[in-house]
Regions:
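Membrane-interface transmembrane helices that cradle and orient dolichyl/undecaprenyl
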Residues: 154-174, 210
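Individual alpha-helical transmembrane segments in multi-pass integral membrane proteins
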Residues: 83-98, 127, 144-152, 186-187
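Signature aromatic-anchored transmembrane alpha helix within multi-pass, membrane-resident enzymes
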Residues: 174-175, 219, 223, 295, ...
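Transmembrane alpha-helices and membrane-interface helical segments
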Residues: 98-105, 156-163, 199-207, 274-284, ...
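Transmembrane catalytic cores of multi-pass membrane glycosyltransferases
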Residues: 21-89, 141, 175, 182-307, ...
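Intrinsically disordered, polar/acidic, low-complexity terminal segments
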Residues: 5-66, 70, 80-99, 103, ...
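Membrane-interface micro-motifs in multi-pass membrane enzymes
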Residues: 117-162, 268-271, 305-336
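Alpha-helical transmembrane segments
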Residues: 5-19, 118-125, 179-180, 218-223, ...
């Protein structure tokens, strides 16, 4: 028992300190800038948040304009006007501790595993390695409050739901508490609340004979909270056209692409693992699989609901949209491993935990080192931008970080890129932020070989590029080039595929690539050295490069 307490205290202390340091070296980004300003009836204003009253009026308008996440975004706006980030860093680190503790409590109640310290550490290790896009779900203010803190509410609700289901709370005077608690837990982020709400409905329809009046109060509260979020005028306006389309082909293609992103681009590692585990168990021993699903039926219904929800909404491009799906997958995976622990040899059990801790320490060290470098780069970016006359700065970021899982540092040479716009507004610079990568900046300002014949992509349009650039560049003969131009890009496979020696495969790939084209915009860039048009390579799929660029009238 003493060893268990020591292990638990040490684990909690280490995790708190580890995340406090990561948060300390995580600068503002994206929506952290946006939510520093008030919302009015006409949208986001240029007036900064300065008081609690400002937050209340701002969130009232935000509900009708943007989305219904009033509770979480109230916290985001509260942290946005603090003079420093110490309070947020402490609370966000505590949120990690609370979430892992609630996961462990829930698993203990469901499985009966009573070695809580080991369960807590094991839960954290799985969470660390499997949580989707930690840079967007655990670190920055808006992201962590929307996803991490909402996950705390969801796990707290699941623990309370299990406790009420098994122990009663039959007294009528508990009703207000259960309803209000349900509302608060459901009134978070629709990406997490909707899947749980659908799972609860399916679960209680399936187990309608076991439902109690206390559970009805709790579930009704959660459904009310979820409804407040998803029925807000702001979120309905944003979702307009997301679910419906007059083109059946487009509808099907978007959902197929959503399925692809879900399993291959959105870092849904836990989902892939638990799906594979259940498929293997189906062929190995269907009785064990049936028993596992029966014991975890609520989680299973939530998991299926999240899958359906993600596919119907064509799945968000960022992995953070999979937070609810991955959270339930992690719970199912941990529950499964606890149930089959007797089948794992004692020797293997003794090896697995130290091995995971060793990998964690290496991963954390590289992540913290990268966060420190990123923080220094952002400070340099702010300083250079404030001192600049035209808003154009050389990117201070390394070409590649050692470990970028906990980083979000995407600034662009496109002044209309959301990160750039938010940054410019926050620092009140009259010129929009334009971050040129080191290669492009040096080519344009220090002279180089960019505009040589061997870098020419298309003679008619006059676009050039080189491997280290993130865009295609064309000179303009006139000053003050402020007009975007529509272009059509005819594409081909890039040099990556030159390693293929089979002439038939190369010929086939070449013919296929010639049929791929994309319409996009060439955006203006005015510097004291000249005027240019830029086409960003991130507009094209990976391993695809421009073969011909045509201006469209």
């Amino acid at each position: 028992m003493r060893k268990e307490k020591i292990l638990f205290i040490f684990s909690v202390s280490f995790v708190f300190l580890a995340f406090f340091l990561l948060n300390t070296y995580t600068p503002r980004t994206m929506d952290d800038f946006h939510y520093a300003f008030k919302y009015t009836d006409s949208g986001r204003s240029s007036e900064r948040i300065s008081s609690i009253l400002d937050i209340l009026t701002s969130q009232f308008h935000h509900y009708f304009i943007s989305n219904g996440r009033t509770l979480v975004h109230s916290f985001v706006q509260f942290f946005s006007f603090q003079k420093n980030d110490i309070l947020f860093n402490i609370l966000n680190s505590m949120a990690i501790i609370i979430l892992i503790t609630l996961i462990s409590v829930y698993l203990k109640m469901k499985t009966g595993y009573n070695k809580f310290a080991k369960l807590w550490l094991f839960s954290f290790l799985f969470f660390w390695f499997l949580v989707p896009s930690p840079s967007l779900t655990l670190m920055w203010k808006a992201g962590s409050v929307n996803y991490l803190w909402t996950s705390v509410l969801i796990m707290g609700f699941l623990c309370l739901h299990h406790n009420v289901s098994t122990s009663g709370f039959a007294e009528r005077w508990w009703a207000p508490f259960l309803i209000i608690t349900g509302i608060l837990c459901g009134w978070g982020h629709e990406g997490l609340s909707v899947g749980v709400a659908l799972g609860l409905i399916l679960y209680h329809i399936y187990n309608y004979k076991k439902i109690s009046i206390s559970i009805i109060y709790l579930v009704i509260g959660f459904l009310i909270g979820t409804s407040i979020v998803i029925l807000s005028p702001g979120i309905l306006r944003r979702a307009d056209g997301l679910m419906l389309t007059t083109d059946i082909f487009s509808f099907v293609v978007k959902r197929l692409m959503a399925f692809y992103r879900m399993f291959f681009e959105a870092q849904t590692k836990a989902t892939m693992i638990i799906v594979i585990v259940m498929i293997v168990q189906f062929f190995r021993n269907r009785f064990i699989l049936k028993e596992f699903i029966s014991k975890n039926s609520l989680l299973f219904f939530c998991f299926i609901s999240f899958l359906i929800f993600q596919l119907l909404t064509a799945f968000p491009g960022h992995a953070r949209g999979a937070m609810g799906l991955e959270l339930t997958a992690i719970l199912l995976l941990l529950s499964y491993l606890i149930n089959i622990r007797s089948e794992i040899s004692i020797k293997a059990q003794k090896i697995i935990m130290p091995l995971l801790i060793f990998i964690l320490l290496i991963d954390y060290s590289s992540a913290l080192s990268s966060c420190i470098k990123n923080s220094a780069s952002v400070k340099m970016l702010v300083s250079n931008y404030i001192d600049s006359n035209n808003g154009i700065v050389r990117s201070p970021f390394p070409k590649k970080f050692l470990n970028d899982r906990f980083l979000w540092y995407r600034y662009s040479s496109d002044s209309s890129y959301p990160q750039n716009v938010a940054f410019s507004n926050f620092y009140e610079h009259e010129k929009p932020l334009i971050v040129l990568n080191a290669g492009l900046y040096d080519q344009l300002y220090s002279g180089g070989d960019l505009f040589k014949k061997y870098n020419l992509i298309d003679l008619k349009s006059g676009f050039y590029t080189s491997p280290e650039l993130d865009c295609y560049v064309a000179k303009q003969s006139f000053k003050d080039n402020s007009q975007k131009k529509n272009v059509k890009i005819n594409c081909g496979f890039d040099s990556f595929f030159q390693v293929i020696k089979n002439k038939h495969i190369v010929s086939l790939m070449d013919r296929v690539s010639r049929h791929y084209s994309k319409k996009t915009e060439a955006k203006p860039l005015n510097t004291e050295k000249g005027s240019y048009l830029l086409i960003f390579k991130y507009d094209l799929p990976k391993r695809i490069s421009a073969r011909e660029i045509i201006f469209i009238d």
